[in-house]
A protein has these predicted regions:
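OB-fold and OB-like beta-barrel modules that bind single-stranded nucleic acids
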Residues: 270-274
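N-terminal ordered "arm"
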Residues: 10-55, 64
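Short amphipathic alpha-helical segments
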Residues: 28-32, 78-85
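Short, intrinsically disordered low-complexity segments
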Residues: 46-80
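Long, hydrophobic alpha/beta structural blocks
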Residues: 84-266
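Non-catalytic accessory regions used for complex assembly or targeting
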Residues: 2-4
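Short cationic amphipathic helices and targeting signals
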Residues: 16, 68-76, 103-109
Length: 274
């Protein structure tokens, strides 16, 4: 028992926030997180929750796609090694040559301070400047890393501070690098079948009125398709119904605020856009 207590005392809870690693021409913060998770699975760490995909203010004019940031929470005995490696991932994979401004935040503690939660709540509906984010990092002595203008720090801080009062799940499938930028080939009938079979446990999969598949993005990013649903079981089941000939790199399930309506808790004021 004595050795077990010492082991637990040496464990560190590490919250990791990542944002703005992508550009309109490529990359995706969730794909980078998928790569990081694959690395972490080979380390002596424990995941404390599902990877979290949090979508913030949808009205941000400079957002790339869904304005989503990612949080990972782990328990580790070697936080320094983990932080160094994740920083390398962000520096190497971010599409900075095409305008990405990645931000990365680390917070070591089981309890997230109220200041993080407040920052995150504002990010759901307000425009928060990178200057405010850098000031927050400085005033709270937060470990961080950024490239470009540092806009990604806003989402990274907000991801760490986000509190789930409701959640859904999102299963994202990723393409192999050789397929990036190529047309996505997916069976429309299988997506129709998936929706009719799994709805309402899954949602936003197929637009019946306009006869349009909703689960596939249209840009050159690594995502092949994404299924949103109420439970882990429902999104995994749905993915087994979707048919495609393309060989995929893999998939990851995120805990998400998609479809929860938490962006609607505040009315956007015109003055906030000035």
């Amino acid at each position: 028992m004595k050795s077990t207590r010492i082991l637990l005392q040496n464990d560190t809870i590490l919250h990791i926030g990542i944002d703005d690693t992508d550009s309109p021409k490529g990359m995706c913060t969730t794909f980078l997180s998928y790569k990081i998770v694959k690395f972490l699975e080979k380390q002596e760490i424990q995941f404390m929750d599902f990877p979290s995909l949090i979508r913030f203010n949808p009205n941000i004019p400079w957002k790339t796609r869904g304005n989503g940031a990612v949080r990972l929470t782990i328990k580790t005995k070697n936080p320094k090694k983990i932080k160094n490696k994740i920083t390398q991932f962000v520096a190497s994979y971010s599409d900075t040559k095409n305008g990405a401004n990645p931000g990365l935040v680390f917070y070591q503690n089981k309890k997230i301070p109220a200041s993080f939660h407040k920052f995150s709540k504002l990010a759901l509906w307000k425009l928060i400047s990178r200057k405010q984010a850098k000031q927050f990092v400085s005033e709270n002595s937060i470990e961080s890393f950024y490239l470009g203008n540092g806009q990604g720090l806003v989402g990274a801080i907000s991801a760490v501070g986000y509190e789930f009062f409701d959640h859904t799940f999102e299963l994202l499938c990723y393409r192999k690098k050789s397929q990036f930028g190529k047309k996505r080939s997916i069976s429309k009938d299988s997506v129709k079948n998936m929706q009719s079979t799994t709805f309402p446990e899954t949602f936003s999969s197929y637009d019946i009125e306009n006869d349009r598949v909703l689960i596939t993005p249209h840009g050159p990013d690594p995502v092949f398709y994404g299924v949103r649903g109420e439970t882990i079981k429902s999104v995994i089941r749905a993915s087994t119904i979707v048919n495609s000939d393309e060989k995929l790199d893999g998939y990851m399930v995120f805990k998400s605020n998609q479809g929860t309506g938490d962006h609607l808790n505040n009315e956007l004021q015109v003055d906030d856009l000035k």
